[in-house]
């Protein structure tokens, strides 16, 4: 019974994440927001089922890659970049503080540059001048830093309010 509940829970999280990404593709203004909301759903799966959250990431990435690319590929690409962070952050937080900051800096740099290159490959007209690469990279780095703070706040909110309100703690008993 417990395995079937876990599978159902993971399916629900995948469906909600896919809907967020579809909304981001339909309304292009919400592309980064939808990727971050889908990543927060991944955080819920990670907090409840630890290692099985990787399956949520993979299934959501495949599903969004199949149908979101028809509208706009940016939310799916941004989810591929932002979605990894809720899975990596607990591992980074277990390291010593200085090494953790170095690893976060490397992730921020790599993901912001990957985002800029992906945007250039998908929408080449958006990066016409060379200084636009730097502006986009700085903006994405700032978004990832704010996303790191959001993860900490959302995790606290999830444990103290949302988990009890949705009765998720009773779901796995």
What is each of the regions a protein language model found here?
Residues 7-12, 36, 54-58, 75-76, ...:
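Hydrophobic alpha-helical transmembrane segments
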Residues 31-41, 69-74, 103-113:
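Alpha-helical transmembrane segments of integral membrane proteins, especially early/N-terminal helices
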Residues 99-173:
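Membrane-embedded alpha-helical hairpins and interfacial helices in multi-pass inner-membrane proteins
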Residues 45-56, 93-99:
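Membrane-helix interface "capping/anchor" motifs
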Residues 1-48, 52-53:
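Hydrophobic transmembrane alpha-helices
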């Amino acid at each position: 019974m417990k395995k079937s509940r876990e599978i159902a829970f993971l399916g629900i999280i995948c469906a909600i994440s896919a809907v967020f990404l579809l909304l981001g593709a339909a309304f292009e203004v919400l592309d980064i927001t939808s990727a971050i909301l889908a990543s927060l759903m991944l955080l819920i799966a990670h907090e409840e089922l630890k290692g099985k959250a990787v399956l949520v990431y993979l299934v959501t990435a495949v599903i969004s890659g199949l149908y979101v690319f028809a509208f706009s590929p940016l939310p799916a690409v941004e989810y591929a970049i932002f979605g990894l962070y809720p899975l990596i952050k607990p591992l980074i937080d277990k390291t010593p503080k200085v090494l953790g900051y170095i690893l976060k800096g490397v992730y921020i740099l790599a993901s912001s540059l990957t985002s800029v290159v992906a945007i250039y490959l998908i929408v080449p007209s958006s990066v016409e001048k060379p200084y636009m690469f730097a502006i986009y990279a700085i903006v994405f780095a700032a978004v990832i830093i704010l996303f790191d703070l959001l993860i900490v706040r959302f995790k606290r909110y999830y444990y103290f309010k949302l988990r009890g309100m949705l009765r998720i703690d009773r779901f796995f008993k």
